[in-house]
Amino acid sequence: MAACVPEKQTVPTVPPELRKLNGRQYQLESSSAALMPLILQGTTNNFGANISKISMEFSPGECRLIVEDGAETNLIVAGMDGTPRKGCVTLNGEIYAVGSTARLTTDEDDRPVLKVFICFTETPSVRIMKFILYSPERMLIRFDELPSVEASLEVLFSLVGGRREPEQPE
């Protein structure tokens, strides 16, 4: 009779690159990005303030972002284990359900990059925040969204007035 040995389970840990950022707060020098994706702001007529400050906290399997924009502060809890964490964000007094994940990767220059995906679960919109880590004191944040503004406008134009043909140079 063969002995049945349980699989060894790995316990999630906080990656060393992120431990250096634990508890840090970052003031954004100049930002034109809001927590809510632009296309969602337009469809809900709820235009949020620009993000001014972000704090980061990490625990095994989770990333916590405290995002300040205008008068509101939102806590985003993102699963780093592949499982989204459910939560809510408040923008101009309106509450939106979100599910968030995060993962640590590297860019083409081998710098650590923390990607956070904030899915607005009642819509098709996703805010993507890429934190490119230069040092514990300095990082670049890139904001993206799905669907992209370009793709959303293309769909809108096709619904409203037919498909637009690209302009031909004269």
Task: For each feature predicted by the language model, list its residue ranges.
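Catalytic loop of the DD-peptidase/beta-lactamase superfamily, centered on the K-T-G motif
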Residues: M1-I95, T106, C119-R138, R142-S158, ...
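Residues that flank catalytic or metal-binding motifs in active/ligand-binding sites
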Residues: V98
